[in-house]
C-alpha cells in the first residue's frame, strides 16, 4: 500500500513537471499575454517530443484548465489561463528562492597561525587607503588565516570565478605590490573581507580574512577551531 502511494506521488510530480515544460514553452511564445496560433507539430519541435505526445499534452493542459484551446479550420489557438499562470508563478518563486541567495555563499575553514605576513601587507598604506575606501572599514593590522577542507573547495573555487572588489597594486621606491581581489564577508555577524592576492605562495585552500577588529580575540578563536564565513559575491 505504501509503495502504491509513493508510485502515485511520483507520477503526480512527473505529470506536473511535464505540464510545466509545455506551459513554459507556450509562455515563451507570449501565450500568457495573447492568444497564439501554434500547431502540435510546432510545439513538438519546441519541447523535443513526438507530434502525438505534444498533442496529448495540450489536451491534458486543457482538461486541467491550464490553457484555453480553440480548434478552427485556420488552425489551433492557445492562451494560458489564470490557473496556468499561477502554476508558472509558483515555479518561478521556487527558483527565485534558490537563486536570490546566490548573492552570498558560506565557506567553512579551520583557523591556523600564519607567519605574520598578513600583518605586514595589511599595514601598508597603499592597501589600507583602498580598504577604507572600497570595503568601508580600517582593518586591524593582521589577518585571520583559514584552511579550507576539501569538501568546501567548490565554494573556494567560486571566488576565483567571481569579479570581487579590486584592490589595485602600487609601487614604492623599493618594490612593487600586486593587485588583491577582495570580497566583503561576515563572521558571526562581524563585518570583514576575504583578501586574495593575485601573487601568493599560499595554496588555493588558504583564505585570509581582514576585519576592523582582531577576530581571534573578538570570537575567542584558537588554532584548530572551525568558523563559517558568509561571503558577499
Curated annotation (Swiss-Prot):
Keyword Membrane tagged: no
GO molecular-function terms, A-Z: magnesium ion binding; nucleotide binding; riboflavin kinase activity; sequence-specific DNA binding
Cofactor binding mode and count: Binds 1 Mg(2+) ion per subunit.
Swiss-Prot/TrEMBL catalytic activity: riboflavin + CTP = CDP + FMN + H(+)
InterPro entries referenced in this protein's UniProt entry, alphabetically: AsnC-type_HTH_dom, HTH_CRP, RibK_CTP-dep, Riboflavin_kinase_archaeal, Riboflavin_kinase_CTP-dep, Riboflavin_kinase_dom_sf, WH-like_DNA-bd_sf, WH_DNA-bd_sf
A Pfam entry, by short name: CTP-dep_RFKase
Database matches in SMART domains: HTH_CRP
EC class (word): transferase
E.C. numbers: 2.7.1.161
Protein residues bound to FMN: 200, 208
Single Gene Ontology BP annotation: riboflavin biosynthetic process
Region of interest: H-T-H motif-like: 1-104
Positions bound to CDP: 114-119, 213-216
UniProt cofactor(s): Mg(2+)
Residue span of region Riboflavin kinase: 105-233
Metabolic or biological pathway, per its Swiss-Prot or TrEMBL entry: Cofactor biosynthesis; FMN biosynthesis; FMN from riboflavin (CTP route): step 1/1
Keywords of this entry: Flavoprotein, FMN, Kinase, Magnesium, Metal-binding, Nucleotide-binding, Transferase
Binding site for Mg(2+): 143, 145
Family: Belongs to the archaeal riboflavin kinase family.
HAMAP family cross-referenced by the UniProt entry: Riboflavin_kinase (MF_01285)
Function noted in UniProt: Catalyzes the CTP-dependent phosphorylation of riboflavin (vitamin B2) to form flavin mononucleotide (FMN).
Protein name: Riboflavin kinase
Organism: Archaeoglobus fulgidus (strain ATCC 49558 / DSM 4304 / JCM 9628 / NBRC 100126 / VC-16)
GN (gene name): ribK
Amino acid at each position: 500500500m505504501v509503495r502504491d502511494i509513493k508510485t502515485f506521488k511520483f507520477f503526480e510530480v512527473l505529470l506536473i513537471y511535464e505540464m510545466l515544460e509545455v506551459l513554459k514553452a507556450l509562455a515563451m511564445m507570449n501565450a500568457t499575454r495573447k492568444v497564439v496560433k501554434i500547431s502540435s507539430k510546432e510545439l513538438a519541435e519546441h519541447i523535443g517530443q513526438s507530434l502525438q505526445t505534444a498533442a496529448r499534452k495540450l489536451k491534458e493542459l486543457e482538461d486541467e484548465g491550464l490553457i484555453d484551446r480553440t480548434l478552427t479550420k485556420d488552425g489551433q489557438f492557445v492562451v494560458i489561463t489564470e490557473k496556468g499562470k499561477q502554476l508558472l508563478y509558483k515555479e518561478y518563486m521556487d527558483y527565485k528562492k534558490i537563486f536570490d541567495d546566490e548573492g552570498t555563499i558560506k565557506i567553512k575553514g579551520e583557523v591556523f597561525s600564519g607567519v605574520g605576513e598578513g600583518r605586514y601587507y595589511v599595514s601598508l598604506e597603499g592597501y589600507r587607503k583602498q580598504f577604507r575606501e572600497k570595503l568601508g572599514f580600517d582593518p586591524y593590522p593582521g589577518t585571520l588565516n583559514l584552511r579550507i577542507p576539501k569538501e568546501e573547495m567548490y565554494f573556494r573555487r567560486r571566488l576565483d570565478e567571481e569579479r570581487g572588489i579590486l584592490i589595485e597594486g602600487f609601487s614604492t621606491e623599493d618594490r612593487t605590490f600586486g593587485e588583491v581581489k577582495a570580497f566583503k564577508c561576515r563572521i558571526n555577524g562581524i563585518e570583514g573581507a576575504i583578501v586574495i592576492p593575485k601573487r601568493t605562495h599560499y595554496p588555493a585552500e588558504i583564505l585570509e580574512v581582514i576585519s576592523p577588529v582582531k577576530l581571534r580575540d573578538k570570537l575567542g578563536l584558537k588554532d584548530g577551531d572551525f568558523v563559517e564565513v558568509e561571503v558577499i559575491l
